[in-house]
Curated annotation (Swiss-Prot):
InterPro entries in the record: Clx_II_MBL (IPR035680), Glyoxalase_II_hydrolase (IPR050110), HAGH_C (IPR032282), Hydroxyacylglutathione_Hdrlase (IPR017782), Metallo-B-lactamas (IPR001279), RibonucZ/Hydroxyglut_hydro (IPR036866)
Keywords (A to Z) from UniProt: Hydrolase, Metal-binding, Zinc
Its biological purpose: Thiolesterase that catalyzes the hydrolysis of S-D-lactoyl-glutathione to form glutathione and D-lactic acid.
Superkingdom of origin: Bacteria
GO molecular function annotations of the record: hydroxyacylglutathione hydrolase activity; metal ion binding
SUPFAM superfamilies: Metallo-hydrolase/oxidoreductase (SSF56281)
Organism of provenance: Nitrobacter hamburgensis (strain DSM 10229 / NCIMB 13809 / X14)
Enzyme Commission number(s) from the entry: 3.1.2.6
Name this protein carries in UniProt: Hydroxyacylglutathione hydrolase
Annotated residues for binding of Zn(2+) 2: 60-61, 133, 171
Pfam families, alphabetized: HAGH_C, Lactamase_B
Length: 255
């Protein structure tokens, strides 16, 4: 593990994230919600932005691209869906493509559902995944453009990652996600422990990410929609994972 990663707040509840390669001084931003906090974080570290790795086209993930590209002349990497309204793109990528940030290698996973163009970036050597608005800590993104089965398939791709991978997501939603998850699995010991940890972190005004994929596999009801205990929690014993996931997402939308 050689990369340096910095996490900070953008907008209201978006996360800004930088991943830096000490060997080459290359630095990538994962999305660009707004330019100001990203520039401030770069200045604090003495880093120069070389890349922006875009996950999807929503405005709260691309709003800072134009200013950052003008200032740093950085490369913009984005999903291959050219219909998505992302400007200033230098490289378009899809499933299985490798993106280099200096000597760091990021593998692209197509994770549609929240949007049709959504991708995640997996840095296997660093044991880290940047999943943006597909997988949150103890939650997942709203299914806006895709379908519930599509989103479920995307979550399964992420669930296949090893337990010791760190998850970075796009928003600080963990407290509300925990509150909802406890309505489904009030007796899940891992979830209750996570709830206590989240309450402590938020009381100290600290972020609840990164988290570990192994912890998500124990406590995230959306990631475990094919677990009989989760199905029972929404009165859908014997239903498919995709169907249980759809019910979970509908309930969360209304919560």
């Amino acid at each position: 593990m050689t990369a340096d990663i910095r996490l900070f707040t953008c907008l209201t509840d978006n996360f800004g994230v930088l991943i830096h390669d000490p060997a080459t001084d290359a630095t990538a931003a994962i999305d660009a919600p707004e330019a100001g906090p990203i520039i401030e974080a770069l200045d604090r570290e003495g880093w120069t932005l070389t890349d922006i790795l875009v996950t999807h086209h929503h405005a709260d993930h691309i709003g800072g691209i134009a200013e950052l590209k003008q200032k740093y002349k950085c490369r913009v990497v984005a999903p291959h869906d050219k219909k998505a309204p992302i400007a200033n793109v230098d490289l378009r990528v899809g499933q299985g493509d490798i993106v280099k940030v200096g000597t760091l290698l990021g593998r692209v996973l197509e994770t549609p559902g929240h949007t049709l163009d959504h991708i995640s970036y997996v840095f296997d050597d660093e044991k880290v995944v940047f999943a943006a608005d597909t997988l949150f800590s103890i939650g997942c993104g709203r299914v806006i453009e895709g379908t519930y089965p599509m989103m479920w398939d995307s979550l399964l791709k992420l669930r296949a990652l090893p337990d010791d991978f760190r998850l970075y997501c796009g928003h600080e939603y963990t407290a509300s996600n925990v509150k909802f998850a406890l309505t489904v699995e009030p007796n899940n010991a891992a979830l209750k422990a996570r709830a206590e940890d989240v309450a402590r972190l938020r009381a100290e005004n600290k972020p609840t990410v990164p988290t570990l994929m192994g912890e998500e596999k124990k406590a995230n009801v959306f990631l475990r929609a094919d677990d009989p205990a989760v199905a029972a929690g929404v009165h859908m014993k014997g239903a498919s994972g995709a169907d249980v996931f759809g019910e979970l997402r509908e309930r969360k939308n209304k919560s």
